[in-house]
Amino acid sequence: MATVGMNDVKNGMKILVNNEPAVITETEYVKPGKGQAFTRMKYRFIKSGRVVEMTMKATDDVEVADVVDTDMRYLYSDGEYWHFMDPETFEQVQTDKAGMGGADKWLKGEEDCIVTLWNGTPIWVQPPNFVELKITETDPGVRGDTSGGGGKPATLETGAVVRVPLFVNQDEIIKVDTRSGEYSARVK
């Protein structure tokens, strides 16, 4: 495996920590007036989402993870596995709920996603930034009922629940930001 020195470590780089892939979220190079320089970094394990902070000497090395981000199209779910296809090679891969990373609540079929593969196996799925989904259940908005912030919960066709404005009704299609899980707009 390839290794890089602490001087070459950057945010967004994918590394191996205890044989598990992680992505670096923050790095800070510190050169104290007295003593040896060191790098303080935060990284998030891709599979579990756990965030860890670590301090390493400037002379230490980290192992680069052999992970690949691939554009793939979500096809379907058979209840236990979610199936994806590479639109160029038509190669198909499947992942379980752990590999979905919470993206399953935003996907209904035929969406383009970024799938992170580690040793050929999907370990993380990043859905599109915005998805258009139909509201299957929500309470009718009562005029003047804005004391609680002017929102109400709505269940979408995939089972996800988001807060929507009072003017949005059942059977309407809305645009949702998958990064925050918030309502973005009503689709006409």
From Swiss-Prot:
Lineage: Bacteria, Pseudomonadati, Pseudomonadota, Gammaproteobacteria, Lysobacterales
GO molecular function: translation elongation factor activity
Family annotation (HAMAP family): EF_P
Superkingdom, taxonomy of origin: Bacteria
Ranges annotated as spanning the membrane: none
Designated name of the protein: Elongation factor P
Chief place where the protein resides: cytoplasm
Subcellular locations according to the entry: Cytoplasm
Keywords: Cytoplasm, Elongation factor, Hydroxylation, Protein biosynthesis
Any Gene Ontology CC annotation: cytoplasm
Protein modification: May be beta-lysylated on the epsilon-amino group of Lys-34 by the combined action of EpmA and EpmB, and then hydroxylated on the C5 position of the same residue by EpmC (if this protein is present). Lysylation is critical for the stimulatory effect of EF-P on peptide-bond formation. The lysylation moiety may extend toward the peptidyltransferase center and stabilize the terminal 3-CCA end of the tRNA. Hydroxylation of the C5 position on Lys-34 may allow additional potential stabilizing hydrogen-bond interactions with the P-tRNA.
